Regions:
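Conserved PLP-enzyme active-site core in the AAT-like
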Residues: 1-130, 136
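Conserved C-terminal alpha-helix-loop-beta "cap" of PLP-dependent enzymes
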Residues: 131-207
Length: 207
C-alpha cells in the first residue's frame, strides 16, 4: 500500500531486532531500532540505529530534499541524512555508547533466545493457570496473530507479553504482589520488568 502511494515503508524493529525479524527481507525500505533496548541489553546507553535498503525510488516532486542528492544514486537518502542530520543536530553516536552497544551485540542471540523462551513459557503457564486473565502473546496458539508470527518469526516470538486483569486496581495489586520483577518503564533489559502503561508511558495518550 505504501509503495502504491510512493511512500517508503518504515519499520520500527526495536522489540524484535534483526535476530527475530529481518524487515528489509519482508519489504521494508527503512528499519529503525532503539538500540538502547535489546541490542544494548543493559540499559546503559541511549542510541538508535537506522538501516536503509537502497531500493526505494524517491519521487523528486514528493521528496525534493532527497532529489538534491540524486548524484549518490540509491544512497541519496543516506547522503541526505549524513549531510543534514549530522550537520544540524550532531546526531552522532558517542564512542563510549557505541562501545557499550557492541558489547551488548555479542550476547544478543543468546539473550533473545532465552528471553523469548522464558516469555513463551510464562505466557503458557499464565493462560493455563489463570483462565480469567487475558494473556496477549503472539507465541500462544490462542493469539489472533499466532499464524502470522509463526510464519514470519523463525527464532521466537519476542520477550514482551501483556495481561488484562479486569481493572486498574487489579493491575496494581498484581504488580505489588510480584517480588522478582522491577517496576520500570523500559524493555530489553537483562532484568525482568513489569509496568502499567496506562499510568506511565501512555499516561497522556488518548484512548
Amino acid at each position: 500500500i505504501a509503495h502504491v502511494h510512493k511512500i517508503p515503508l518504515i519499520l520500527d524493529n526495536t522489540t524484535a531486532t534483526a535476530y527475530l525479524f529481518q524487515g528489509l527481507k519482508h519489504g521494508a525500505d527503512i528499519v529503525v531500532n532503539s538500540s538502547s533496548k535489546y541490542i544494548n541489553g543493559s540499559s546503559n546507553s541511549i542510541s538508535g540505529i537506522l538501516t536503509y535498503s537502497g531500493r526505494f525510488q524517491w519521487d523528486p516532486e514528493m521528496y525534493p530534499q532527497i532529489a538534491a542528492y540524486k548524484k549518490f544514486g540509491p544512497m541519496a537518502y543516506i547522503a541526505r541524512l549524513r549531510n543534514s542530520l549530522f550537520r544540524d543536530t550532531g546526531a552522532c553516536l558517542a564512542p563510549m555508547n557505541a562501545y557499550l552497544n557492541l558489547i551488548g551485540m555479542e550476547t544478543l542471540g543468546l539473550r533473545m533466545e532465552r528471553q523469548c523462551s522464558n516469555a513463551l513459557e510464562l505466557a503458557q503457564w499464565l493462560e493455563e493457570t489463570y483462565p480469567s486473565v487475558t494473556v496477549n502473546y503472539p507465541g500462544l496458539k490462542s493469539n489472533n496473530w499466532y499464524e502470522i508470527a509463526k510464519k514470519q518469526f523463525s527464532r521466537g516470538y519476542g520477550a514482551i507479553l501483556t495481561l488484562r486483569v479486569g481493572s486498574k486496581e487489579n493491575a496494581f495489586a498484581l504488580i505489588d504482589a510480584l517480588r522478582i520483577p522491577y517496576t520500570l518503564s523500559n524493555i530489553g533489559d537483562t532484568k525482568t520488568l513489569v509496568i502499567h502503561p496506562g499510568s506511565t508511558i501512555s499516561l497522556h495518550s488518548s484512548e
